[in-house]
């Protein structure tokens, strides 16, 4: 994989320094990119490989006070979202991508169309509107041993809801 990071350097040319127990930000940047590639391809096994199964905590937009806890629940929520918005995509290359220590962050565009029912975590089913969304999307992730243990997914939820016709 080769993508622009920090000016003219590419991922494949950045130095990767770190012990087996503490992966370097470069490695985590590569993993972040691969994770979003897995999301776009609906490759759920690869998606799972980058999230700590037992204790990952994921804060979805609009649900900051009720995060998803555990890899299986995060996968289930992600699969439900992708079923409702089957053409959704995280744009690559990212507009901004950086890492520091155990953290990575990116900013990009997130798009999709609401074409199938969406089941919410509480069991409520929202019927599709056929409307599309395009929002600025960012993720801040904390990594441990090559897996995300804490993830903040951010986009303007009010704009998202308005664009898909739910507000």
Language-model features, listed with the residues they occupy:
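C-terminal and inter-domain tail/linker signature
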Residues: 2-167
